[in-house]
Amino acid sequence: RQDVDYDLRKVRNEKLVKPIYFTQFPRDLDNLQSVQLKKETFIKIVLPLIVAENEKILDDREKLKVLIEKKFTSDAEKQWLRQKLLEYKVKKGNLDELLIRMDMIPVSIALAQAAKESGWGTSRFALEGNAIFGQWTWDGQGIAPLKRDGDKNHKILKFPILRASVKAYK
């Protein structure tokens, strides 16, 4: 319990976030009586996931910069580039566009949207599908909203763990 307990004011001042990763929200998060405690708990769960994803993006960005400067790339590097082009939905071979799109997630915006879309981690989508940001899907892989209009067929994307939701957010 002490490992998870850290002061968000210190995070704001020192910019250090403990690398503690929850795979899902606690089911009893909504039972917390204090709204302030509920919000702090939510931030302590989601913030490290966003920071970790940003670190991964920065690492990938540095790797991409190196590959752009190389005259020849290995088969493994070519495969990595193909995967990143798909991941960021960039047309084949447009590495300059990939570099532009491969950018950090704005932490404050991500936290605000996550809080709103997931009801501070207490929504059905957050609890049943680790869906933090409320991304829609039409391919059948998700959770159907209970009050969806009859003429609609979208679902909310479902994820195996919270980190996957953050990864998909970019």
Label for each model-derived stretch:
Residues 1-112, 116-170:
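Catalytic cores of secreted/periplasmic lytic hydrolases that degrade extracellular macromolecules
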